[in-house]
């Protein structure tokens, strides 16, 4: 990273290995103490207006499948949708996955029709709130509430808050996290996907804590961490699913932002190296995993899922924000 100094020393360039985090950014919100400071702060969605070829490519995305998926996808059918109707039978996972990108595209392009469509779904989320703090579809497996879809929707709500400053987001997240505090450990994050991906829940907890300073949130983050799959193993992984690995290797580093325990940070780097040491043969920097990484299938003919690629990109960006490491 290079940084130009003040006008009094114009022409001088200082090279640093990572940004200085001692000063507090007065313009944009980072992590609230005692969380470790972020090295890079994500700008609120919509604060940068694209021009030129970047805008053109975003418009192509709007005019293509992303912008029109609701017209053709059964999962986004509004009648009896799980995010719009109590007991709805479809869309519990697919809606927030799509909305996460669709809504950000709407805000960045400031597209009125897309913003209105986004608002329709967001209002459905608010309408789903229950008195105990839970929100969204009720999806139970073996009598235990499954929370993976909520983890995705929480990210949609954060983007909506950045765009709108709608206080209902803060209230919903606060009430939902209070509900999570009431769930016994033996009934929390027991399903495969949510158990692997608890780190996404922690990121949302830290986002809310940085806005409100509610102390119980740090206690909840510890609870989520201890009930999430163990991504700190030195020579193995909790599972070998490509999306889980790309998405979840950052969980220990995320928790490091609270504990300051360097072993947590090293664990994330270890997973990154471990999977690539054996399976890192896919052009472009990914590891080979046709759904799962499999011993014996380690050559460049192996593929990887598109969703594994995008989760790796997201993880790399989040890791950069947290660590400052290039």
Which ranges hold each PLM region?
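Glycan-recognition and catalytic cores of secretory/periplasmic carbohydrate-active enzymes
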Residues: 10-326
């Amino acid at each position: 990273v290079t940084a130009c100094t003040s006008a009094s020393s114009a022409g001088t360039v200082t090279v640093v290995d990572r940004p200085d985090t001692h000063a507090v950014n007065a313009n944009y919100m980072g992590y609230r103490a005692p969380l470790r400071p972020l090295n890079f702060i994500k700008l609120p969605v919509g604060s940068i207006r694209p021009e030129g070829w970047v805008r053109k490519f975003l418009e192509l995305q709007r005019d293509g499948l992303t912008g029109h998926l609701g017209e053709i996808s059964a999962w986004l059918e509004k009648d009896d949708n799980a995010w719009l109707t109590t007991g709805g039978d479809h869309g519990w996972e697919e809606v927030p996955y799509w909305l996460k990108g669709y809504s950000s595209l709407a805000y960045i392009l400031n597209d009125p029709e897309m913003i209105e469509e986004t608002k329709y779904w967001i209002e459905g989320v608010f309408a789903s709130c229950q008195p105990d703090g839970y929100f969204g579809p009720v999806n139970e497996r073996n009598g235990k509430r499954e929370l993976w879809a909520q983890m995705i929707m929480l990210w949609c709500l954060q983007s909506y808050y950045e765009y709108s400053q709608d206080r209902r987001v803060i209230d919903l997240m606060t009430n939902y996290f209070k509900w999570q505090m009431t769930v016994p450990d033996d009934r929390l994050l027991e399903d495969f996907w949510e158990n692997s991906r608890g780190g996404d829940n922690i990121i949302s907890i830290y986002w809310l804590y940085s806005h409100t300073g509610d102390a119980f949130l740090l206690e909840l983050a510890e609870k989520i961490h201890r009930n999430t799959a163990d991504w700190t193993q030195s020579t193995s992984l909790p599972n070998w699913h490509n999306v889980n690995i790309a998405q979840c290797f950052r969980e220990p580093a995320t928790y490091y932002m609270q504990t300051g325990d360097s072993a947590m940070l090293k664990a994330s780097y270890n997973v990154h190296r471990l999977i690539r040491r054996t399976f890192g043969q896919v052009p472009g920097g990914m590891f080979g995993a046709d759904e799962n990484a499999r011993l014996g299938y380690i050559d460049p003919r192996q593929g990887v899922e598109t969703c594994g690629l995008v989760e790796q990109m997201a993880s790399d960006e989040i890791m950069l924000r947290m660590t400052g490491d290039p």
